[in-house]
């Protein structure tokens, strides 16, 4: 099996890296197969970057034009002035989309924190989104507290930091500890060190329940069966999302919160089925 480092290198090698200047700052985008028609835009999770989609971008790009953003304030994108949480990023996100795609609506896939961003954008600038896929999103009023998350202290050794990353990945992101490799810990460290968005208040709210009434696009949901945020309550989500045009709600067996990483083949198959080229 290819190491995660080689997977990342292969995806990066086949991507075109774009630095897009907007009024809110410079945004970094990676694109695969840009000429393949309607854009599929991928928004990653909190404390992440485009590499949250490392196991998806190449398979998806065999059928679609795939555009992965480093969220403003995360990854290599600049932090917009005053931005602290997902509700501050709708305008920067819209600016990036308009710079790249003009007025063309896109298919948008939002994972976790990225799904919150997509939800705000769909409510505030609905013309920019044709179809939306929510992947393990919080903000639905049901997210479990994760009591065994651990923080970092000044002066920690590299080994101590890696131990905390391992603990936190297993607590919230990954269900099967066999999916946590040294390469994944290094990737997590690199992503976390670039996280300049320091608030996560909205993730613990039910904001999407009210926003969904303003969504005009069709909506799909993909969740991991073992998502730590929704242990014991996953079955309630389709009813909670009854206020939008929810077309499908897919649950992938055995996968945790980071479903597109732990069950990439199943996820890619479902996503392409939900977002066929029109």
Regions found by a protein language model. Name each.
Residues 144, 159-217:
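Conserved alpha/beta-hydrolase catalytic His-Asp/Glu region
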Residues 54, 67-109, 269:
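Active-site loop/oxyanion-hole signature of alpha/beta-hydrolase fold enzymes
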Residues 32-76:
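Conserved HGGG/HGGXW glycine-rich cap/lid loop of the alpha/beta-hydrolase fold
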Residues 1-40, 61-64, 101-102, 170-171, ...:
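Alpha/beta-hydrolase fold catalytic core
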Residues 119-123, 130-160:
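Flexible "cap/lid" loop of the alpha/beta hydrolase fold
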Residues 110, 114, 118:
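Gly/Ala-rich beta-loop-alpha elbow adjacent to hydrolase catalytic centers
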Residues 223-255:
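Conserved loop-alpha-helix segment in the C-terminal half of the alpha/beta-hydrolase fold
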Residues 255-264, 268:
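Catalytic histidine-centered segment of alpha/beta-hydrolase-like enzymes
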């Amino acid at each position: 099996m290819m190491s995660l480092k080689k997977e990342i290198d292969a995806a990066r090698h086949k991507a075109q890296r774009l630095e897009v200047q907007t009024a809110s700052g410079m945004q970094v985008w990676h694109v695969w197969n840009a000429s393949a028609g309607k854009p599929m835009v991928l928004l990653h999770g909190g404390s992440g970057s485009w590499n949250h989609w490392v196991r998806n971008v190449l398979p998806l790009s065999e059928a679609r034009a795939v555009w992965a953003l480093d969220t403003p304030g995360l990854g290599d994108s600049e932090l917009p002035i005053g931005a602290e949480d997902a509700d501050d990023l709708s305008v920067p996100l819209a600016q990036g989309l308009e710079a790249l795609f003009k007025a063309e609506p896109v298919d948008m896939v939002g994972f976790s924190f990225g799904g919150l961003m997509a939800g705000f954008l769909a409510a505030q600038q609905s013309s920019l989104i044709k179809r939306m896929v929510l992947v393990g999103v919080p903000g639905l009023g049901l997210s479990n507290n994760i009591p065994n998350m651990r923080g970092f202290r000044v002066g920690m050794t590299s080994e101590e930091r890696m131990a905390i990353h391992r603990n936190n990945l297993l607590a919230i992101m990954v269900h099967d500890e066999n999916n946590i490799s040294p390469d994944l810990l290094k990737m997590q460290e690199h992503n976390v060190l670039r996280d300049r968005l320091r608030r996560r208040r909205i993730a613990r709210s039910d904001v999407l329940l009210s926003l969904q009434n303003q969504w005009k696009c069709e909506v799909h949901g993909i969740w991991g069966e073992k998502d730590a945020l929704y242990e014991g309550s996953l079955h309630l989500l389709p009813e909670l999302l009854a206020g939008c045009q929810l077309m499908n709600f897919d649950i992938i067996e055995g996968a945790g919160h980071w479903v597109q990483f732990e069950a990439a083949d199943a996820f890619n198959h479902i996503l392409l089925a939900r977002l066929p080229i029109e």
